[in-house]
Amino acid sequence: MSFRGINTTVIQIRRQVFTEVARMAYANVKGEQANHLMRKIPYTIIPGEEGKLRKDIFLERAIVEERVRLAMGLPTRRMDEHNSVVSGLEDASIADKYYDPPLVNVIKFACNRCPEKLVKVSDLCQGCLAHPCMEVCPKKAITWESGRSTIDQDKCIKCGRCVTVCPYNAIVKTERPCAAACGMGAIHSDELGRAEIDYSKCVSCGQCLVNCPFGAIADKGQIYQLIQGFNRGDRIYALVAPAFINQFPSLASTGKLKAALKAIGFCDVVEVAIGADLCTVDEAHDFLEEVPEKLDFMATSCCPAWSMMAKTAFPGLAKNISMTMTPMVFTARMMKQADPDARMCFIGPCAAKKLEASRRTVRSDVDFVLTFEELAGIIEAKDLDLASLEVDPAEQDLIHASAAGRGFAQSGGVAKAVADKIKEWHPDMDVKIASAQGLAECKKLLMLAKAGKYNGYLLEGMGCPGGCIGGAGTIADPARTAVQLNKYVKEAPFTDPEQSAFMSNIHVLKDDPDFEL
């Protein structure tokens, strides 16, 4: 389970790191002054002379140092080599700098070396006469010793049947939280028992980093580079994903959100749900053209973790992933065409969007990617009094996207929007859809599709539980966000994506003069 909505110590430290990195960037200093500020951050976050978290203040500060480096887009340091915390800072100070892979990293000396998977009998065992645990074990791994059940770990296959039948809940099944959260099976143990990521499988969804109770996993960020752009006077647009709802309770209205984003340095704010409207229409066209004549089924393309998983784990199905641009790319490209000298910053719930933005085909459209958590750190660093922010009456709301576009933020929303559009064009057509959330479930969906169970279907996959609102970069509890999102969808100024004032741009953005609505 993740800890969104619970203000744990791990989350507090993560957000403090974002805030202090942003403060350092706003200070706009170079050289030794910048080095000094960076070296100071661990002492600001972990003050005093005694460790309170791991009983070793030097270890606590060393871990914070690595988190600071990653938040600035710098790589973690090797443990067997001497390397200053400020190593590479000069390169990171360039506003055009983008981080090098890998995006998601394990801070090795922060890892607790949790067991990969274990079933064990606790002290709650009552030594009952029925001992159903022994009876159901398919490998006869449970025996009776000293008046209680004992599990032979060499025989145990971790099936969990004993856990289910124990009347005292005395048998527990534990698993490394980061590995349990990884739907790709990309996390295993290194030779020292620490978590290690197999990057040939990892799709950077970020679920491991929000599920690690020790805060040993973190992703790279562009907070520092973005603020360098502000300092330089660049015109930078904030492209805000619809999952922003409920993430910032102090910003009770979209007008307040826009005011806050402009106060920290953005020139204007655009809702990415506009791009979702364009995506809906384009994907509906794709489905009608491709299925079933050319493809057995078509899968949506909006979630980069889902599409990357499909192409990595099921290379033969890569052709079934829609070629439609994601809402982020549609929106960024549209704004770049309207303001060619400006730069674009996507602000959303997703770690995988950072990976998407680094692709060669997207890099020229999207300059920066921030998560909502990182944005919260920047707002904190700016010391904004959110309650007294003045809202321009002419710009009180984000009112340029449809209800369907706003609904992309929730699992099932993309497929529903596309299917509804197809049914509008072809009322007699039965559009069958299926969706999955979380990469493990997404893999099951594609396995069934590969076996021919979903021929003629439109499939939607969301890498995070709940969809975008459950992304690794969110702040609020996804269940509560879902309630607020549904309200936000109902408040949209129109329902049909084709009513968008920006729909006429679609053929230009696709570079397809023959595209017709």
What is each residue range found by the language model?
Residues 118-130, 155, 201:
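N-terminal pre-triad scaffold of radical SAM enzymes
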Residues 1-82, 219-517:
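Iron-sulfur-associated redox domains of electron-transfer enzymes in respiratory
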Residues 59-62, 66, 84-89, 97-102:
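Extended, highly charged accessory segments
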Residues 130-153, 161-198, 203, 207-222:
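Iron-sulfur cluster-binding cysteine motifs and their immediate structural context
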Residues 121, 152, 198, 240-241, ...:
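A secondary-structure boundary/capping signal
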Residues 112-120, 143-148, 189, 207, ...:
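Gly-rich Lys/Arg/Thr-decorated short loops/hinges at beta-loop-alpha junctions or inter-strand turns
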Residues 93-122, 139-140:
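N-terminal [4Fe-4S]-dependent radical SAM core
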